[in-house]
Amino acid sequence: MHEHLKEKLAILPDQPGCYLMKDKQGTVIYVGKAKVLKNRVRSYFTGSHDGKTLRLVGEIVDFEYIVTSSNLEALILELNLIKKHDPKYNIQLKDDKTYPFIKITAEKQPRLLITRNVKKDKGKYFGPYPNAQSAHETKKLLDRMYPLRKCSNMPDKVCLYYHMGQCLAPCVKEVTEEQNKEIVDEIIKFLNGGHKEVRSELETKMYEASEKLEFERAKELRDQIAHIDAIMEKQKMIMSDLVDRDVFGYAVDKGWMCVQVFFVRKGKLIERDVSMFPIYDEPEEGFLTFIGQFYENSSHFKPKEIVVPGSIDSELVERFLEVEATQPKRGKKKDLVELANKNAKIALEEKFYLIERDEERTIKAVENLGKQLGIETPYRIEAFDNSNIQGTNPVSAMIAFIDGKPAKKEYRKYKIKTVQGPDDYESMREVVRRRYTRALKEGLPLPDLIIIDGGKGHLAAASDVLENELGLYIPMAGLVKDDKHKTSHLIIGDPPEPVMLERNSQEFYLLQRIQDEVHRFAITFHRQLHGKSVIQSALDDIPGIGDKRKKILLKHFGSLKKMKEASVTEFVEAGMPKNVAETIYSYLADKKTL
């Protein structure tokens, strides 16, 4: 531990507040809150931790803290700090999980819509529906039962919906405000839980139609009743008070937290939400952070009541969210919390089972690959690929797989330095020489298997450098592609012999992942360099632009396209003098010069 950390830990206050953990660049990597800052912050640097927390602690070189007057203030501050700094180790609940709502528009001739975009308008919103299919089925039923306008724009003649009895055709007929209000009121009654009442009314109308020998009408009403029954069958009544509430449960294991939310609407359990994420805090603190972010999402409306597990400070939740929060001791609500807890525990168990199963499969694939090639199990595999499009910016890339999984910190990029023109074989010789000369010099771990993305020529070039120049005898195989540029087979030995693998085997899938990954890494690097060279060459003829300013512009804008779209002011903001900014702008505006 850094000495200055020990000094700061010794003077931490025993008050509530927030703490910000920083890495060696001074970047905030984690924000947390605590009832007692002294105890919580010190706990990171004492005792035993799981692997994820150890990784976090290993990156901490400094921290700050902010004392607050209460736990509630700490919770609010924490959420704001997470928004501001976006730390990589914090819970990241994104707003992309939006649920659909059913909307009745406030137009003169209202419409019934499905939307995920809730606006502050005069429309009426019902939901959310975590199950999108349920929302669409409900709307489809309402469209059949209540003839509101369907078209977004008023056509000049009636459409098919009018002939189907699903629209009153306000485009060509007068539909009064009273008529629309009557229909809208019926829809609202249905969506607010009045299914039984609506069903009863339809049943009465069906019998009346039968008595009048209006069999087509009776059949239509019977079908509507059947649709209501089908939808209601999926939403069983679990609470008799018809209160809208969200019921929370959670479980923690192996450094992960799973939170399950049951959405109870009008007494019915309509759906659940599952979130799973790494946790570096006490479970109760992690849960409070989660619930704060959960209701910041625009698709999560606060219900009348929030039900939380017994370990959570419900008073704090209530004051923070400004909604009733309860901790049931008995009864149906307690049963629901326990069910949510149980589901969260099962979800974590399934996650770890799948991880362990995948790890077993991956290790087995590595072992089988070694057997197929007649070598020791290649726990560490390094793979090389060249990228050279039209002879410009030749590069190579090396990736590493350890225990069958990508080790991205071990990846390396190489600009080709000694080869003139496009020469794949010489490029391969150069990068293999550079990689393993450095590995020997610095005592870096050597691979159990080297894979060269290429055929016999590439393999021969790499083997020659490895054995004859460096004196290393590491198993090396060439990865051969088919005519569709897909993984075909390996070649190994001297002379190289093909090794065919079963295409549905785990070891073949492993090779595919390695080939795809090294190709992706190499070509991404090539495109980055190519993009930079395009920008630099485009700026060569502009007066006042030397290498230093080229680098500044490249770093600020990133692409020629963005530079061409920029204004004089934006070039000044990038650090260019105004006269130079005007020159750049004029030059790039003249497309003939590019």
Curated annotation (Swiss-Prot):
This is UvrABC system protein C. Belongs to the UvrC family. The UvrABC repair system catalyzes the recognition and processing of DNA lesions. UvrC both incises the 5' and 3' sides of the lesion. The N-terminal half is responsible for the 3' incision and the C-terminal half is responsible for the 5' incision. It is found in: Cytoplasm. The lineage of its organism: Bacteria, Bacillati, Bacillota, Bacilli, Bacillales. One of its GO terms (biological process) is nucleotide-excision repair. CDD domains: GIY-YIG_UvrC_Cho. Keywords: Cytoplasm, DNA damage, DNA excision, DNA repair, Excision nuclease, SOS response. Residues 14-91 form the GIY-YIG domain. It holds the Pfam family UvrC_RNaseH.
